[in-house]
């Protein structure tokens, strides 16, 4: 018997987030699962709320997951999207650039996303860590852990304008920016690719009597069902999958290398103010 609603936390990186979680709330309530959600302005606040017991589940960014596990080593990732698995980030140059290898970026300007973006900053810069580059960060949506792609888009614009020699971005965003015209189609070239990594997950710290039911209903969502497909499209997936954690090792190493969080989950990045 569920004694209280399962409360989920999510970060309001875009106005559509309200529509998404209102839709999920209707989905769960229609299946007799008491459910509610709370929105946060940034991930650090959400992680602290999860660890502090103010919410039961957090829809966490990969960086938020890293911090959650440092603050609460027994934390679990219970589910994720099919589109959260096996992503890559790329370092891109203009097609006419003389740069052919990452080492040739030494001494040159490289544009990145916000300081807290795993895919637009931390992971690609870890790839370039042994190359002395001039980092130019485009600080859009700080605290949103890269969910707002504005920083990556601004880095891409700087690349197209010749203001930087290279730009870092999620591989999927490289395709998006070329499609939307931010980058000229065929006008860029990839010079480095990160190993595969995973993105968001539903994180839990403490048990709740409705948690198993929540996961079961989540995994049962069917993209072929016209009632749930629009909601899944908004959240950018075709299937929910069980959570896994081995796709975050690369980010854990980058967090340590750049001192973003301390070993106990304390925020340590210089000048980071979400």
Predicted regions and their residues:
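Conserved functional loop/turn residues at catalytic and ligand-binding sites
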Residues: 54, 109, 163
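A ligand-binding cleft/hinge motif common to bilobed small-molecule-binding domains
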Residues: 59-72, 129, 157-186
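Acidic, polar ligand-binding/catalytic clefts
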Residues: 49-104, 116
């Amino acid at each position: 018997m569920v004694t209280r609603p399962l409360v989920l936390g999510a970060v309001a990186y875009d106005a559509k987030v309200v529509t998404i979680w209102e839709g999920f709330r209707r989905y769960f309530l229609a299946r007799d699962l008491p459910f509610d959600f709370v929105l946060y302005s940034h991930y650090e606040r959400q992680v602290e709320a999860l660890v502090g017991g103010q919410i039961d589940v957090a829809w966490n960014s990969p960086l938020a997951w890293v911090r959650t596990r440092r603050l609460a080593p027994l934390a679990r990732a219970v589910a994720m999207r099919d589109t959260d698995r096996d992503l890559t980030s790329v370092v891109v140059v203009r097609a006419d650039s003389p740069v052919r290898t990452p080492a040739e970026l030494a001494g040159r300007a490289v544009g990145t996303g916000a300081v807290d973006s795993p895919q637009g900053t931390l992971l690609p810069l870890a790839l370039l860590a042994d190359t002395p580059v001039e980092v130019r960060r485009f600080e859009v949506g700080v605290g949103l852990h890269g969910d707002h792609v504005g920083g990556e888009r601004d880095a891409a614009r700087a690349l197209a304008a010749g203001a930087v020699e290279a730009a870092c971005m999620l591989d999927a965003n490289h395709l998006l920016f070329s499609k939307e015209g931010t980058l000229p189609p065929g006008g860029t070239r990839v010079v480095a690719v990160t190993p595969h990594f995973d993105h968001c997950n539903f994180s839990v710290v403490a048990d709740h009597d409705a948690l198993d039911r929540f996961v079961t209903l989540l995994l049962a969502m069917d993209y072929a069902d016209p009632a749930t497909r629009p909601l899944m499209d908004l959240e950018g997936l075709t299937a929910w999958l069980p959570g896994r954690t081995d796709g975050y090792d690369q980010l854990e190493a980058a967090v340590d290398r750049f001192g973003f969080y301390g070993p106990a989950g304390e925020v340590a990045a210089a000048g980071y103010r979400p």
